[in-house]
Swiss-Prot record:
The keyword Hydrolase does not apply. O2 binds at H59. GO terms for cellular component: blood microparticle; haptoglobin-hemoglobin complex; hemoglobin complex. Involved in oxygen transport from the lung to the various peripheral tissues. Belongs to the globin family. GO terms for molecular function: haptoglobin binding; heme binding; iron ion binding; organic acid binding; oxygen binding; oxygen carrier activity; peroxidase activity. InterPro entries: Globin (IPR000971), Globin-like_sf (IPR009050), Globin/Proto (IPR012292), Hemoglobin_a-typ (IPR002338), Hemoglobin_oxygen_transport (IPR050056), Hemoglobin_pi (IPR002339). This is Hemoglobin subunit alpha-A. Red blood cells. Heterotetramer of two alpha chains and two beta chains. The lineage of its organism: Eukaryota, Metazoa, Chordata, Craniata, Vertebrata. Coiled coil: none annotated. Pfam families: Globin. Gene3D superfamilies: Globins.
């Protein structure tokens, strides 16, 4: 999926407004995913999956960091996330559908905290960005 110049601008605008809360939103995204899609818990058997746990917060920070890295390298997301893609495909062997589920949960978290920010156009741009990130992270599975 190709991001237009307008999509890139919209995504940068969203992350410019949420970056101060990115770590918290990353943790909230994981909490939401584990609630809505409880089968995802199987990938984290060693985690305390209770809301606000230190492990959820730490992994949420990693999720947020990866998304910020993708935004900061929006013209080369594949290059920016190459090592992360290798890790998930070759070592962790995460089911590729999980990235889409995580992206959907992140979109909901942004909508909950910033409803006026997500105009239909911005929503579409952010969704395209998250789908692009998901595609990049699953590329090494082929």
């Amino acid at each position: 999926m190709v991001l237009s110049a307008n999509d890139k601008s919209n995504v940068r605008g969203v992350f410019g407004k949420i970056s101060a809360h990115a770590d918290d939103y990353g943790a909230e995204t994981l909490e939401r995913m584990f609630t809505v899609h409880p089968t995802q818990k199987t990938y984290f058997p060693h985690f305390d999956l209770h809301r606000g746990s230190a492990q959820i917060k730490a992994h949420g920070k990693k999720v947020a960091g990866a998304l910020l890295e993708a935004v900061n390298h929006i013209d080369d997301i594949a290059g920016a996330l190459s090592k992360l893609s290798d890790l998930h495909a070759q070592k962790l062997r995460v089911d590729p559908v999980n990235f889409k589920l995580l992206g959907q949960c992140f979109l909901v978290v942004v909508a909950v905290h910033h409803p006026s920010l997500l105009t239909p156009e911005v929503h579409a741009s952010l969704d395209k960005f998250l789908c692009t990130v998901s595609t990049v992270l699953t590329d090494k599975y082929r």
